């Protein structure tokens, strides 16, 4: 008998149907069409159902997208802009999807892959630069980061740790307490926890250590746990010298803009040489992105850059083509016990 006419706190039938469809791998579009409901209604049913399941069975939480994120007390979901709500909804309906771009060594042998985001929005596929700048909410950044981390874990498991997968950590997430929890969840989801070195985090160069002292602490704690940390966007157009005495990274990635400028700007070339020399002295890796021609590849290789990313190596591919790209770039390279960033 119900007390005071209240309904039990279990799943409703629509919520159960939504959860079963999610766990069976049905796309949001197919499930919404089959049930004759809108994507928004399906999203609300999934969200409500997942919340109830996690409350009663917290051990199931790591298997759900974004479940390791603690809601920000100062920033409830209702405070998101209309664009950010649409973006979070697109993540759950899989309209935001990953693509993978290879990172190769000087022999053009595969070392890793960076995971990039694309958005199938209203029939057009948006590149990351077309929607990421419009995200201001910390919560929206956390949900997107959790989504990409989950893709990285799945691919490390699927491909037995053959190469590393790099995930971008935006400045808004770099100092957040949730980052450490998310990474611990990711480690637990790896079939072999020692493969955590295959999960590389790219911190944006505009992460402000002076303003957010927590960022440096997060980086240090992540490195102690075995994760490899890379500084992304070195010497970009808006670059300021990162406090390298405060934080030491495992790798440094030259921004595409300075790679493009090096052939006509002696100052840009000098900066590249200085970073390469610093990496050699500190036993760090030096990568270059935006390598879109054989000429750039050869010049950077001659300077001492040891890893390369760009269309001259391979264009980004969808998850269904990752194995094929890995085979194309594996060549006859000898297997290594560890994967250096």
Tell me what each language-model feature is:
Residues 1-41:
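Helix-turn-helix DNA-binding segment
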Residues 3-6, 50-78:
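Basic, Lys/Arg-enriched C-terminal extension of HTH/homeodomain DNA-binding domains
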Residues 25, 36, 54, 235-238:
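Central "turn" residue of the DNA-binding helix-turn-helix
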Residues 42, 75-78, 120-122, 202-210, ...:
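EAL-family c-di-GMP phosphodiesterase catalytic domain
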Residues 45-48:
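Residues within the DNA-recognition helix of helix-turn-helix
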Residues 66-97, 135-139, 179-180, 322-341:
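C-di-GMP signaling machinery
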Residues 72-134, 309, 316-318:
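Active-site core of bacterial EAL-family cyclic-dinucleotide phosphodiesterase domains
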Residues 110-112, 140-216, 290:
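Catalytic core of bacterial c-di-GMP phosphodiesterases, primarily the EAL and HD-GYP domains
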């Amino acid at each position: 008998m119900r007390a005071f006419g209240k309904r039990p706190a279990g799943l409703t039938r629509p919520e159960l149907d939504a959860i079963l469809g999610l766990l069976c791998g049905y796309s949001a579009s197919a499930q919404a069409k089959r049930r004759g409901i809108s994507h928004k209604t399906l999203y609300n049913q999934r969200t409500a159902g997942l919340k109830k399941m996690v409350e009663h069975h917290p051990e199931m939480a790591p298997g759900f997208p974004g479940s390791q994120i603690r809601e920000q007390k100062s920033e409830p979901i209702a405070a998101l802009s209309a664009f950010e709500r649409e973006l979070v909804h697109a993540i759950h309906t899989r309209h935001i999807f990953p693509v993978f771009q290879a990172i190769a060594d000087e022999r053009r042998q595969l070392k890793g892959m960076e995971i990039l985001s694309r958005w199938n929005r209203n029939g057009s596929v948006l590149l990351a630069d077309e929607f990421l700048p419009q995200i201001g909410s910390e919560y929206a950044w956390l949900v997107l980061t959790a989504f990409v981390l989950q893709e990285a874990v799945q691919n490390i498991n699927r491909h037995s740790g053959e190469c590393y997968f790099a995930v971008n950590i935006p400045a808004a997430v770099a100092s957040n307490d949730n980052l450490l929890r998310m990474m611990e969840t990711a480690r637990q989801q790896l079939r072999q926890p020692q493969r955590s070195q295959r999960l590389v985090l790219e911190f944006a160069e505009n992460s402000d250590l002076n303003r957010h002292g927590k960022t440096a602490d997060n980086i240090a704690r992540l490195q102690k746990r075995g994760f490899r940390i890379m500084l992304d966007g070195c010497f970009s157009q808006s670059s300021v010298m990162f406090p390298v005495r405060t934080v030491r990274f495992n790798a440094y990635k030259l921004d595409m803009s300075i790679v493009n400028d090096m052939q006509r700007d002696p100052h840009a070339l000098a900066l590249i040489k200085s970073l390469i020399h610093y990496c050699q002295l500190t036993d760090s890796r030096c990568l270059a992105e935006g390598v879109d021609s054989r000429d750039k590849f050869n010049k950077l290789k001659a300077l001492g850059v040891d890893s390369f990313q760009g269309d001259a190596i391979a264009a980004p591919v969808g998850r269904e083509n990752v194995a094929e790209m890995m085979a194309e770039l594996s060549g006859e390279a000898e297997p290594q016990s560890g994967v250096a960033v």
